[in-house]
Amino acid sequence: MNLHEYQAKELLASYGLPVQGGILAHNGEEAAAAYDKLGGKFAVVKAQVHAGGRGKAGGVKVVKSREEAKEVAESLIGTNLVTYQTDANGQPVNSVLVCEDMYPVQTELYLGAVVDRSTRRVTFMASTEGGVEIEKVAAETPEKIFKVTVDPLVGLQPCQAREVAFQLGLKDKQINEFVKLMTGAYKAFVENDFALFEVNPLAVRENGALACVDGKIGIDSNALYRLPKIAELRDKSQENERELKASEFDLNYVALEGNIGCMVNGAGLAMATMDIIKLKGGQPANFLDVGGGATKDRVVEAFKLILEDKSVKGVLINIFGGIVRCDMIAEAIVAAVKEINVDVPVVVRLEGNNAELGAKILNESGLKLTSADGLNDAAEKIVAAVNA
């Protein structure tokens, strides 16, 4: 689960991090009032969406008057912002953050942290190249990224934070200020089950003070059950409608840009299914894992979910019956096809537990369902049907 910038800054500020001041506005009048309250020579109006690349997409604007703040806010709120991290439809802008005047600054730094899967520990990354995408820095000048791996038994040590401060070129009081900032960030990371933390840029102001000009936080969704206050911050308007609906039925769904819907049990088999569709010249429209313990109701909902995507021209159902029985899946498929007006070809491949019984149910249903003998055959049949 992602947080908006204003939510991330509020959370980080509660852990003692120095963040850029800002006021949330939901309309032009509120943005103008926020500009007056901040009282600087200029302000920055930032669209609040769950996506990076806002500046290049026109979602971050410098304003020099209350009238301009109102005008920019009204031009953003109610629209969809399309960035390199969104799909073609973009993300809806429901509010803007009017931020205080902090420039010019001495320099812009970068500080971020993730859970490193290779070490299975929290790893901090810092760089002197702030204000640009860290991916670009990693690709072009990887030597400018400094990494610190934290031992979970002892936590982040002050000496580790000081070493990073030295590498960033900080001096005197800035070093202690940075140690406090990085320590607070680690505490926030652990206590709130972050999956991602990023401050870009971390500005060194003209007076030498540090300030988090931006803030990006991703929360581990698996931990939301123990984070009720964080869960309340969820903005469902920023999530794909079908992915949101899928989560309500414990389905793992990711929308893609193809035209062949996929329903599979097991993430590995789902990825293999998408691979072979591509190999045969097709384009998968989604990743959909109904899980090893799929129930009849979940399969029906999964089928509905796939067909809600108007770009879907055919459906491939690939089920390996291990825990789940193929006859139960077959009954669910028949029920879903009868309930929904299915006007696209459906190819079904069943293997494993009660596969023969499942195939019998499909064949005797009287519905236009095509059985496949193996994954290769299934992929060839659905690609041919879609291209027919």
UniProtKB/Swiss-Prot annotation:
Listed EC numbers: 6.2.1.5
Keyword tags: ATP-binding, Ligase, Magnesium, Metal-binding, Nucleotide-binding, Tricarboxylic acid cycle
Taxonomic superkingdom: Bacteria
Record: residues binding ATP: K46, G53, R54, G55, E100, Y103, E108
Residues annotated to bind Mg(2+): N200, D214
Pfam families: ATP-grasp_2, Ligase_CoA
Protein name as catalogued: Succinate--CoA ligase [ADP-forming] subunit beta
